[in-house]
């Protein structure tokens, strides 16, 4: 019997990739990456010369098909694998990235009459121009005491589905009326592949306020009478967990991709969330940290708990049969990059060059020689606001304790420690809310690059940290869901637990907490938490006052 394979399609912000994976052992056989021709559209609408307003971030849905039709044939060619041996395809996508489409599934921006209307295009996840609509939703929900607010830390983000949908209605009612569906890009790709609209629970729950149902028509009517039946008329109330077979690959799509018609197509998922089983996690109490420019924390529990400061709790949102809790830090790697770029003197860069290493490695070696607390420097990790547990984008970073003898290495270590304190705050909040966290797993770009950071995280949280073996954990996890959608009868797996047992692996390196270091960090964390509560919970609004002065000064220039 021929070896069987699956393909994970990972749609990111700037590019898309395909990872071809062997079903029997998770071997990553081939990968192809293709950038989107139009990238992130935040200046001029393509083909129109129309200038976009500030905070807009759009994409061209043609780019998604462009990538699809290139990366899959490429991994087949590079690997020598026959399309007949591919048993499943799964997709993940940034979210909320949504668009209006007609009855045939054609995005309205691809129709001549709407090509020059920005609201007919794909609104990318980081489109923030729907903030007024988000404010209206939050104010009304708070006024009415809507229970859904508590599930999302007390605020609905402008990045999410309903603010974006309401913006279309507000600014372009003709687009809203012409749309047969408002749909997530991830669900649209599934529709293109198999001809079936099967909306996934992950994005519905975390980005569209779904909790085995949506908010009532009465709530939407109170926002705008025209919005009353947005769910009935423009969406779907049929929601499916990960790993469900959405349908079989359409013959015309199979021909373009070099695959066989009827190949299993899985329901979609959000990029971070699909990675969890690829880190070997298939049950409750094990937190997966996707560590890169920002940090996403995911953990499953057996009971629904409403915990302040979480990004959401969704049944079947991460793993079928569990409640998935999501939290996050808006900047981690981005803070380190900022520090290296703006706070390190040229002399350090030259010393690093002479030592044959980069600045991170050079400072990391010096910082590793310090003991916890030795620098006397402490930071609040809010360079890009705070997602969890304060849910406040207007908070800013803070560094204190510097003297005339403070070194770049001491400051660098304090920055690393601050991000670990941010994660520790999230863990404590979850556990105090009744969600135990027994183990930590890490994946993403940072764990393999910064061993000092990982040891600090272990010491601060007082937990062992295991590292995913794959450098493409998201795409691998995505592919695993394709194997589940295919099922054992086709050579795949009937559930994600069996898939993970065969296809997911961990590195040999395990970061174990040092009890003495943790004892020292508890003292530092107590100070961190005092500052966290002072500046983050309204005790002192100095950060917001400074930000307001800055904004006013720039407007007055």
Sequence positions of predicted segments:
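A polyampholytic, Gly/Pro-enriched intrinsically disordered region
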Residues: 50-57, 131-156, 285-288, 484-501
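Phosphate/pyrophosphate-binding loops at sites that engage ATP/ADP/AMP, CoA/4′-phosphopantetheine
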Residues: 68-87, 172-175, 219, 223-232, ...
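N-terminal phosphate-binding loop and adjacent alpha-helix
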Residues: 33-81, 124
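Conserved phosphate-binding catalytic cores of ATP/NTP-utilizing and phosphoryl-transfer enzymes
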Residues: 1-2, 250-259, 269-286
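Gly/Ser/Thr-rich active-site cleft segment
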Residues: 11-13, 138-269, 336, 380-387, ...
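Stable alpha-helical structural segments in soluble proteins, enriched in small hydrophobic residues
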Residues: 67, 71-79, 189, 276-279, ...
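Glycine/Thr-rich phosphate-binding loops that ligate phosphate moieties of nucleotide
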Residues: 1-43, 62, 84-138, 174, ...
């Amino acid at each position: 019997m021929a070896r069987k394979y699956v393909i994970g399609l990972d749609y990111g912000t700037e590019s898309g990739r395909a990872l071809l994976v062997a079903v029997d052992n998770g071997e990553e056989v081939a990968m192809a990456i293709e950038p989107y021709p139009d990238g992130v559209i935040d200046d001029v609408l393509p083909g129109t010369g129309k200038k976009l307003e500030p905070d807009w971030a759009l994409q061209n849905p043609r780019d998604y098909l462009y990538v699809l039709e290139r990366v899959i044939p490429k991994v087949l060619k590079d690997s020598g694998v026959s399309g007949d041996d591919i048993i499943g395809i799964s997709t993940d996508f940034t979210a909320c990235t949504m668009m209006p489409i007609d009855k045939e599934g054609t995005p309205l921006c691809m129709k001549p009459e709407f090509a020059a209307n920005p609201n007919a295009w794909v609104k990318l996840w980081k489109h923030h121009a729907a903030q007024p609509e988000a404010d209206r939703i939050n104010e009304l929900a708070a006024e009415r005491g809507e229970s859904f607010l508590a599930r999302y830390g007390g605020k609905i983000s402008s990045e999410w589905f309903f603010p974006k949908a309401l913006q279309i209605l507000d600014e372009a009612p003709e687009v809203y009326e012409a749309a047969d569906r408002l749909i997530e890009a991830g669900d649209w790709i599934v529709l293109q592949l198999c001809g079936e609209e099967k909306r996934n629970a992950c994005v519905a729950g975390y980005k569209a306020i779904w909790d085995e149902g949506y908010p009532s028509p009465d709530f939407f009517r109170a926002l705008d009478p025209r919005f009353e039946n947005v769910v009935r008329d423009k969406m779907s109330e049929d929601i499916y967990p990960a790993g469900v077979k959405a349908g079989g690959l359409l013959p015309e799509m199979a021909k373009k991709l070099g695959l066989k018609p009827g190949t299993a197509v899985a329901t979609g998922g959000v990029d971070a969330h699909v990675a969890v089983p690829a880190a070997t996690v298939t049950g409750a109490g094990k937190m997966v940290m996707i560590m890169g420019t920002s940090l996403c924390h995911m953990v499953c529990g057996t009971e629904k708990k409403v915990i302040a400061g979480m990004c959401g709790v969704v049944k079947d949102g991460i793993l079928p049969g569990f409640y998935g809790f999501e939290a996050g830090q808006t900047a981690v790697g981005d803070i380190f990059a900022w520090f290296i770029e703006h706070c390190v003197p040229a002399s350090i860069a030259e010393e690093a060059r002479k030592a044959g290493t980069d600045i991170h490695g050079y400072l990391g070696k010096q910082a590793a020689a310090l003991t916890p607390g030795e620098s006397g420097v402490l930071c609040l990790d809010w360079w890009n606001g705070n997602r969890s547990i304060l849910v406040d984008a207007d908070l800013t970073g803070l560094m204190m304790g510097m003297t005339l003898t403070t070194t770049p290495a001491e400051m660098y270590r304090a920055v690393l420690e601050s991000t670990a304190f941010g994660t520790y705050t999230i863990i404590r909040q979850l556990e105090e809310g009744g969600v135990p966290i027994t183990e930590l797993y890490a994946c993403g770009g940072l764990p393999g690059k910064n061993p000092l950071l990982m040891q600090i995280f272990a010491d601060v949280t007082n937990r062992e940290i295991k590292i995913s073996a794959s450098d493409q954990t998201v795409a691998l996890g995505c592919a695993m869901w394709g194997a589940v959608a295919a099922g054992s009868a086709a050579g795949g797996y009937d559930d994600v637990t069996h898939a993970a047992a065969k296809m997911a692996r961990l590195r040999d390196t395990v970061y174990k907490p040092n009890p003495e270091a943790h004892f020292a960090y508890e003292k530092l964390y107590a100070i961190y938490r005092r500052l966290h509560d002072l500046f983050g919970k309204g005790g002192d609004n100095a950060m917001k006052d400074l930000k307001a002065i800055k904004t006013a000064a720039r407007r007055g220039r």
